[in-house]
Amino acid sequence: CLCRDGEILKNVPPLGYVLGDEGSGAVLGRNLVNGIFKGHIPLKEEFLAAHGLNYEEIIRRVYREGMANRFLASFTRFVARHIDRPELDELVCEAFRAFVRRNLAHYPADAEVSALGGVACHFERQLRHVLATEGMRAGRIVETPDEGLLNYHIWNRSE
């Protein structure tokens, strides 16, 4: 959302992991599974062994159990462990690029982009790279809301 002086001026809805949520852990996990099973990411055996899963189990967990978004988001740790692989670096950059183009493009180009959450923190290098290549200025990237609120009050306190 676009905020100024603590007030939300504009908000593009995320729409959840099925309809949107570009750049989220669920989308990274979904794209990872897609890339692995469609042969674009050559880490299938390692991925399945690391999670004790097979194709049928993944399909069952995604389509027949609740919280598929959390299940898919759990695979971001695998992405983080293998981020040195060009395929996974690009997977993350593509997700952030989609986020920027579908969400941030609706805000003023000169707005500083700050981010909150584990995905932004763990893939900060990729996020900053995408923001720069899309002509945007990166601000603070923090993992937890508490850290963000604390920094806000530290940097904006009146003395």
Place the predicted regions along the sequence by residue.
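Phosphate-binding/catalytic loop of phosphoryl-transfer enzymes
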Residues: C1-E45
